[in-house]
Structure formats: structure tokens, C-alpha cells
């Protein structure tokens, strides 16, 4: 169901998906929800559309930190999950231990007795089978469908009551305009009928249902009528928003509004003003960037966009680095060129006291890396809650840490673990501000010339630090080209060429090599930059640069 390019590349669900399958005489509506806490806006709305849920856990890894986030929301909604232990055909799979870990998590999250008595199955999605006991034959998915019919209660809505349809997801079509997706809680809806939309402020807007669609497989099918319990997509209401209710115009009854977690992280999107501006992007002006951000608000409920004192800058807030990183990467692939600032946490006042967001951080590392992780997280105000030593030379660590303590940590974590560690985190709560957190300890290497970086200049400067670029890369004044070995920033001329004489030959460079550059992905760049630095984003390049006006375009 993950059709978005970024979803396929990252192996995560970003946008919720709807489908429906018919098993025996029952239509089963299925909604795939994101698991990562950054997409909490999607998760909470989806849980309001369903009567039950299937919790899928890995037979080897057990519940992940993002599992905790989704499960907590499901339990708060009173849902009773069916647990499916997946990938039981993998090496090192330990299905029964995974079930025990799930039970521990249920108890930790305050599940009631009925929820803790959850049904569970063993499955392999790749091989296409599910079974009630490990000793059963590997056949098909029928045991899972039977479990759904047995344990998920039928819809409680009444098709004879006045219409109540809650908007839980927004979509957009060039032909139909805004499309609202939601569940019919009561009543019946017909294509072409007049309906009323109860807005958040209580205002009632009337409109005609121009198109009514249902779900079948991975497609949408046009419907003439649908009734309570079904998930439908409706066109006709151009200004509908998440949580509002489509109802009967003669007897309007609004459902309770959906509460979504507020953003915890913010950054500034601005027009690219580097010396290379406008050379690689199709959409580069402030108007084009603003229009794209406003369009994103139509479907991305957890996002906030604010205009600033400068017409070239926009404040963008989201649920986390992944949430904002997905938006930046999507815009980049669409041809947009812009620059973004370092992510900053959003502070809140709780009971008259300034507070900041805290995260639950889970690490899976080799035993040799445990000491380095504990030391560095301690410097970032992290408190270790749990530590488990595995029998396979691996250790699982759990920390509670301020969200700002995680900004820039992933790069350090990969160095400490030599790329062998697994890191996951999810939003926990707001707590009093804890004080200063140590920032990046090394300065950066900055180009003070515009031109093309040469092997000769880079080789001479190699002992100053590590580079982010290779010879032949175009650079400009103020562009960050590497990390200094010392705490201070250092400006370099990387465009210097070798002066050839009778005693020197160009072939001499072929005998020596540069160290491999540090690759800067978008996520790594966002974590790496400091408060006086920017990430320049274009369809072709990710560059780091200084914010100082002396380096900006004249």
C-alpha cells in the first residue's frame, strides 16, 4: 500500500492508505497507518475511523519505539489489538519472546485486562501465510481474516439516523478539487444529495455531494449510496477541514472534534540567496515556495506555516525532523530550490512554567559502543532508563532525553557505532526546560573563493579536517566544504591550482589519493548545521553554507 516514492525508499508509511476486501459475506475496511511519531496527525485520525486494529511486530526485534507510540494511541481509544508476529521464517526469529515483549509493553502502557488478553497469530507477509500456532501448516492468510471477524466488533452506527460523517483525511484532485475521506458514523449518504458541513467554529456550510467514492482493493470506485460503518471519499466541500462533520442539512449534528498533537519542531524556509541561486531549480521565488507550502496545508494536518516579517522567509513547524525532512525532500523532487535553517524545538508553557518536548530514545548497539553512547547522551542531558545485554554481543539502551538533545546526534551515533547501530525515538511529553546542551564540538571548513575545488588544494588542506565534497565540485564563498579538526571555523581556498614547472608533472597527483568524503544526505545535513548555518536545497544538490551576510549574494 506504500505507493509514495519516499515510502518505498525508506521502508516506512508516511500517509495513511485505505482499502477494502471482501471475505465471505463481510466487507473489511483496512487502513494502513504510519508508525513513526512524527506522523502522529495521521495516526490519531485513522484510529478514529476503525473498530479494531492489527498490531504487526517483528519476530526477531519485537516492538519498536514507534510501536509504543501507535499502540498507546490505540489503547487510549479503547481498541483491542490483534497481534501478528511477522517474519517468523527469518533466521534468529523468536516469536514467543516477541509475544512476551508485546505483553510487557501493553502492561507498561496501562492496558486494561481485556486488552492484555489479546489474540495473537504467527505470520510471514513475504510467504503469504498466517497461523494460530507455530506447529500449524503454512497455508494462507485465512486465519488472520477469521481472527478479524471473531475479534473486531461490527460498526455500531445506525443507517436510519441523520447523516454524520467525520472528515479524517484530506486529498486533492485537479478535476474534483478537495476530497474529504472519512467514516460514516450514522445515516446514509447519496451522490448528488445536499449536505451540510459543520465547521470548527459551529458555522454550517451547505453544498452538493458532487461525487461519492468507496474503496476496493487499491482503487477508488464510484458509488451511488453508502451507509453507516463504511469509509468513503466525498467531493463537493471545497473548504472542509480535518475533524469537521458532514451531516444532514435539516438536522445538523456535529461529532466531537479530533484533537491532534501540536508541532514540536520548527525551522525557517527561505528563498535561496547563495551565489548559485536559480541555477538548478524550476521553482525559486518566494511566491512559488509560499504557494507550495500553503498547498501542503490542505492535506498535512500536523504542519503549520507562518509568514514572517520578511516576504522571503516562512516559519514551518512539524512533529519532528523526519516529518519536516519528508516535506523538504518532496519539494526538492518537485523542482523547488530554497534554503532551510537548523531545526529548533518549540517551547510551551505548562502550569505557568516554560517546558520543552522530551523524547523516548531506544538504541540497539554493539557492546563496544555502549560506553560512548552513554557518555555522549549524558552530555546531551539524556537519562538512561533501561539497559539490556543481549547474548549476541548486542545491547539495548533506553533513554529519556530533551528533543533538542537529539538534534545533530544521529551523525555522532553513527560514528560511535561505526554505522552498526539502530536508533529510534518517539515523543514522550513536555517537561521543564533543563538548561544548556552542548552543541557540535568541531568547527567547519569554509570556502572563501568561488570556483571549482581542485585535488591539489584539497590535498594540501586534508590535515585540517574531513571534507564533504570531492575535487571538481563547484564551490562558492561561504559554502561549508568540511568539518575542522578544531573547535573554530576555518576559511580555505580550495580552488588553488598547482603551478607546473620542469621539475613538476601533472601525473604526480595520480600517485596519491584523498580520503573518502563524508556524504551529506538531507537528514544528516539538517542534523549537522548550527544556528548560524543553512542547508541549500535544490533538485540536484544538497549544500551547507554560512548564514552570515558577508557570504550572501551581493
Task: Indicate residue ranges for each PLM-predicted region.
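Structural and coupling elements of P-loop NTPases
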Residues: 1-554
Amino acid at each position: 500500500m506504500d505507493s509514495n516514492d519516499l515510502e518505498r525508499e525508506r521502508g516506512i508509511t508516511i500517509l495513511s492508505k485505505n482499502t477494502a476486501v471482501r471475505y465471505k459475506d463481510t466487507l473489511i475496511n483496512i487502513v494502513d497507518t504510519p508508525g513513526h511519531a512524527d506522523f502522529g496527525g495521521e495516526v490519531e485520525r485513522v484510529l478514529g475511523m476503525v473498530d479494531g486494529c492489527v498490531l504487526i511486530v517483528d519476530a526477531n526485534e519485537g516492538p519498536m519505539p514507534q510501536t509504543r507510540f501507535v499502540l498507546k494511541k490505540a489503547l487510549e481509544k479503547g481498541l483491542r489489538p490483534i497481534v501478528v508476529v511477522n517474519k517468523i521464517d527469518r533466521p534468529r526469529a523468536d516469536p514467543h519472546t516477541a509475544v512476551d515483549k508485546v505483553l510487557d509493553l501493553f502492561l507498561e502502557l496501562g492496558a486494561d485486562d481485556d486488552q492484555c488478553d489479546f489474540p495473537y497469530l504467527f505470520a510471514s507477509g513475504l510467504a503469504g501465510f498466517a497461523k494460530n500456532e507455530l506447529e500449524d501448516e503454512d497455508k494462507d492468510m485465512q486465519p488472520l481474516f477469521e481472527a478479524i471477524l471473531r475479534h473486531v466488533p461490527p460498526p455500531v452506527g445506525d443507517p436510519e439516523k441523520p447523516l454524520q460523517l467525520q472528515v479524517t483525511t484530506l486529498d486533492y484532485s485537479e478535476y474534483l478539487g478537495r476530497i474529504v475521506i472519512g467514516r460514516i458514523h450514522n445515516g446514509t449518504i447519496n451522490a448528488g444529495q445536499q449536505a451540510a458541513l459543520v465547521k470548527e467554529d459551529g458555522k454550517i456550510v451547505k453544498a452538493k455531494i458532487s461525487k461519492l467514492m468507496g474503496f476496493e482493493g487499491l482503487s477508488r470506485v464510484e458509488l451511488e449510496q453508502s451507509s453507516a460503518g463504511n469509509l468513503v471519499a466525498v467531493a463537493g466541500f471545497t473548504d472542509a477541514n480535518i475533524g469537521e462533520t458532514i451531516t444532514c442539512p435539516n438536522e445538523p449534528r456535529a461529532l466531537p472534534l479530533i484533537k491532534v498533537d501540536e508541532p514540536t519542531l520548527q525551522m525557517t524556509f527561505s528563498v535561496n540567496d547563495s551565489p548559485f541561486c536559480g541555477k538548478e531549480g524550476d521553482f525559486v521565488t518566494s511566491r512559488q515556495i509560499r504557494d507550495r507550502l500553503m498547498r501542503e496545508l490542505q492535506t498535512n494536518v500536523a504542519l503549520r506555516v507562518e509568514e514572517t516579517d520578511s516576504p522571503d522567509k516562512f516559519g514551518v513547524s512539524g512533529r519532528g525532523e523526519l516529518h519536516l525532512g519528508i516535506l523538504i525532500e518532496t519539494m526538492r523532487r518537485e523542482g523547488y530550490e530554497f534554503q532551510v535553517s537548523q531545526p529548533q524545538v518549540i517551547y510551551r508553557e505548562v502550569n505557568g512554567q516554560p517546558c520543552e518536548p522530551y523524547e523516548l530514545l531506544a538504541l540497539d548497539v554493539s557492546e563496544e559502543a555502549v560506553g560512548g553512547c552513554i557518555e555522549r547522551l549524558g552530555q546531551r542531558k539524556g537519562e538512561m532508563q533501561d539497559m539490556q545485554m543481549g547474548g549476541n554481543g548486542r545491547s539495548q539502551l533506553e533513554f529519556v532525553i530533551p528533543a533538542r538533545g537529539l538534534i545533530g546526534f544521529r551523525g555522532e551515533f553513527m560514528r560511535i557505532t561505526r554505522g552498526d547501530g539502530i536508533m529510534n525515538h518517539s515523543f514522550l511529553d513536555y517537561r521543564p526546560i533543563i538548561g544548556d546542551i552542548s552543541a557540535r564540538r568541531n568547527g567547519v571548513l569554509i570556502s572563501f573563493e568561488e570556483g571549482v575545488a581542485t585535488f591539489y588544494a584539497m590535498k594540501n588542506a586534508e590535515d585540517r579536517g574531513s571534507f564533504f565534497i570531492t575535487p571538481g565540485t563547484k564551490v562558492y564563498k561561504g559554502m561549508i566544504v568540511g568539518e575542522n579538526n578544531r573547535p573554530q571555523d576555518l576559511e580555505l581556498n580550495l580552488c588553488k591550482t598547482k603551478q607546473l614547472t620542469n621539475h613538476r608533472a601533472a601525473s604526480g597527483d595520480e600517485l596519491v589519493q584523498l580520503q573518502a568524503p563524508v556524504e551529506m544526505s538531507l537528514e544528516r545535513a539538517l542534523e549537522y548545521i548550527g544556528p548560524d548555518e543553512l542547508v541549500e536545497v535544490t533538485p540536484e544538490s544538497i549544500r551547507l553554507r554560512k548564514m552570515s551576510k558577508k557570504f550572501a549574494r551581493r
